Amino acid sequence: GERDYGVGPVPAAALTALVCAGLAAAVGARPELAVWLLLVPLGVLLTAVDLAVNRLPDVLTLPMAGGAAVLLGAAALLPHSAGSWPRALLGGAVLGGGYLVLFLISPSGMGFGDVKLALTLGVALGWYGWGVLFVGAFAGLLLGCCWGAVLVLTRRAGRGTAMAFGPFMILGAGAGLVLGALGAG
């Protein structure tokens, strides 16, 4: 049957529209905007799912990673694109590899869904450069760690409590994309 992910269709659509409008304002009429506008609804959906069930399903994360790589490859062929497709692919490998190392060090501390999500976010952030990749990835880690600290300090969670980390990764990557787009403009 249907599953309730805690966010109704109207708030999810409003959030998606707001994020798309912000990215459109930052990116302008460049080819990569179409890619970001296709990825945003998936990011919002992944955020809702992860917050509800602490899981990032393969049915969303894997096609999202492949789609981002292929679509940015097409965007790179068009005039006025502001990024680098080879660097985007390397960014996916670097961020995905970094999260894989974190997962291997502590499988109970990092879900494998986060590793797969990192592939997509690395591709997207890598498009605009290594600095953008670092800022977006670090912002996600910092936001997640701060939220985890708040939960522990308010005794709403302990050190071993599972926490949805994907939403923070996505939020950090979104901030990185906006900064990258503005810097490329």
Language model segments and positions:
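A membrane-topology feature that recognizes alpha-helical transmembrane segments
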Residues: 1-185
